[in-house]
């Protein structure tokens, strides 16, 4: 199961915003959204945000914050989502949950998923699903030595709901899509800036410790979709590759698809597989490289963040 996008560490958000604030733009495209925090912050500056991610879980979280300009979950909606969530049925509708959670926790997530269908709007569904995904991340943050410190999951859901910030209404028609990257980029019109977080190099694959994998399996209702998902990524930026030249070829194809967009900011993790110079040379074939910004996070993460503007 491949990892099509990269979730940058939270400490990099300030770096990304610092670079983006140096430019004037009223609209931005995020082909790989991952964490929606950047898009949500940009909305505060009245920027129109066009977000996308091939993962349904990332797309759902983006809907809840980026596309949502004002809708909030009500008490009644939260009560409906949490109704009878610990009551087991004949069998789990999503047995893949047992890969990640205990039997009791699996029932909670299985029932939550079914209760989401009671919500009347796509944004309400996305907000409640995002809260449930945060609860799952909370559960997976404990180990056998700290598990006794956990709170009941329904209590955690309510606490997260009560802590939600007010939706940011920037008065813009922000959109979120769940498409492959080249299709999303090709359909963009009138966008001032593309901020492209490059996917992990070297064909990183999900394993049983990858939080993004459990979210996707929970939201899709099982784990039998991965083969089809891999096929849909084949030959596109984000697919697993064996060589540097393969990665750079896929990057070039994507950037040529984006040649109609005025300005680019390309975020890259300098991990050694593909160098910043390699990426800058590919960008330079299509657009003029203006600047390269770097931030060393090696003491925290062992990596260096790079943003190339063109």
Regions found by a protein language model. Give the residues of each.
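S-adenosyl-L-methionine
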Residues: 1-44, 58-61, 67-68, 134
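SAM-dependent nucleic-acid methyltransferase catalytic core
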Residues: 12-13, 18, 100-211, 220-237
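Short beta-strand element of Class I
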Residues: 47-52
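Conserved SAM/SAH-binding beta-strand->alpha-helix loop
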Residues: 55
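Short, conserved SAM-binding/catalytic segment
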Residues: 63-77, 160-171
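Class I S-adenosyl-L-methionine
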Residues: 150, 158, 273-310
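Conserved phosphoryl-transfer catalytic core
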Residues: 65-118
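Conserved Class I SAM-dependent methyltransferase catalytic core
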Residues: 237-287
């Amino acid at each position: 199961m491949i990892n099509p996008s990269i979730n940058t560490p939270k400490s990099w958000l300030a770096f990304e915003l610092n670079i983006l604030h140096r430019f004037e733009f009223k609209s931005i495209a995020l082909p790989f959204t991952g964490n929606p925090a950047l898009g949500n912050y940009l909305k505060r500056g009245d920027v129109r945000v066009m977000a996308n991610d091939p993962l349904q879980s990332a797309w759902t979280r983006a809907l809840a914050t980026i596309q949502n300009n004002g809708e909030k979950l009500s008490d009644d909606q939260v009560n409906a989502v949490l109704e009878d969530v610990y009551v087991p049925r004949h069998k789990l509708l999503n047995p893949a949950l047992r890969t990640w959670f205990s039997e009791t926790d699996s029932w909670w997530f299985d029932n939550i998923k079914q209760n989401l269908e009671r919500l009347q709007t796509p944004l309400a569904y996305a907000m409640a699903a995002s809260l449930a995904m945060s609860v799952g991340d909370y559960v997976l943050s404990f180990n056998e030595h700290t598990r006794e410190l956990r709170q009941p999951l329904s209590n955690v859901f309510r606490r997260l709901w009560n802590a939600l910030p007010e939706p940011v209404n920037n008065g813009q028609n922000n959109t979120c899509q769940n498409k492959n990257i080249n299709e999303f980029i090709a359909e963009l019109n009138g966008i001032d800036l593309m901020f492209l977080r490059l996917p992990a190099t070297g064909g990183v694959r999900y394993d049983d410790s990858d939080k993004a994998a459990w979210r996707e399996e929970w939201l899709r209702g099982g784990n039998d979709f991965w083969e089809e998902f891999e096929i849909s990524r084949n030959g596109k930026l984000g697919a697993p590759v064996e060589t540097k030249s393969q990665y750079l070829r896929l990057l070039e194809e994507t950037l040529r698809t984006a040649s109609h967009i005025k300005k680019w900011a390309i975020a890259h993790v300098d991990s050694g597989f593909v160098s910043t110079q390699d990426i800058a040379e590919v960008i330079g074939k299509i657009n003029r490289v203006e600047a390269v910004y770097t931030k060393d996070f090696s003491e925290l993460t062992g990596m260096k963040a790079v943003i190339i503007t063109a």
